[in-house]
Amino acid sequence: MIFKFESGASTMHGISRRTFLKTASASAALAAAGVDASWLMANPLGLPLGLQLYSVRDLLPKDYEGTLKQLSAISYREVEAAGFFGRSAGDVKQLMTQAGLRCVSAHYSYPDLAPHLDEVIQFGKTLGLKYIICSSPGVPDGSAAKGADGKVNRDAMTLADWRWNAEQFNRIGERVNSAEIRFGYHNHTGEFRTQDGILLYDEVLRLTDPAKVTMELDCGWMIVGGKNPVDYLERYPTRFSLLHVKDFKMSGKPGSDKEPPPSAELGQGSIDYRPIFAAAKKAAIKHAFIEQEQYDMPPMEALKIDAEYFQALTV
């Protein structure tokens, strides 16, 4: 496995007509909403710079409004939520708008999502979400992957467990999509194991209806799990709508999100995003969210490094 992926494509300092049109459309929409879009061209995907708010999970409970404003000040324009800390959808929307941010997606674990789906959908509609993402799977009653505490061990899930999840995702996706929000699933590393000669993630892709379930590709976790995002973006160019962009200092062999390699700022670890972004530009990616799991410096300093790397990268 080569973690610094090599690309035979030459580096391009311009952008394609397709990327220009996508960028122009997004710029016009943001301008109509009163948001400065002058920064939009300065990144390799021609997309608003996004952040998964799990990256600031320790800061938001202490100063929600201030943290959002700090993120906006270092060029982030879109965010994906990972919890709302007891705030109402209206409150979150107002604070996002005041900070110059748009919350376009939100993560929910399966246990937080399935039993409360009507509430989640209504919250998302009020907030203006485009996506509701299942960030971790569930398991049926009796599954050995469910511990005594009710928590699911993804690395212990069987092929049958994942097939059950695909069925649930189709059901949930139909209901979410009827509210004009897209439903999707976000990977970690446990999906990239093989059982009975079948790669678990591939089985989820096979069994989920693309009209009901889109995919959020976490590039970092896929690589830690031993697979190459470029391969998946090329094989399934219409299945992925969102990316997670993170870096790790890899050991040279596949690992697990349970015992992950050390996190790194973008460009400081082992992952070369140029070929990944080149493949993403040819796929159906609509949003890209930087995410950093851990820090060895103040989070805002690290996230500024991440933002600057992302915006300066050429493919």
Segments predicted by a language model, with ranges:
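N-terminal secretory signal peptides
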Residues: 1-15
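N-terminal twin-arginine translocation
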Residues: 13-19, 30-44
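Active-site acidic/histidine proton-transfer and metal-coordination neighborhood
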Residues: 25, 78, 85, 102, ...
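C-terminal segment of N-terminal export signals and the immediately downstream linker at the start
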Residues: 35-62, 69-70
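Acidic (Asp/Glu)-rich catalytic clusters
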Residues: 43-44, 68-73, 87-103, 118-129, ...
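Conserved, mostly hydrophobic/aromatic
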Residues: 51, 71, 79, 96, ...
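Short, acidic/polar
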Residues: 59-70, 114-123, 225-232, 273
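Acidic/histidine-rich catalytic cores of soluble enzymes
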Residues: 178-270, 277
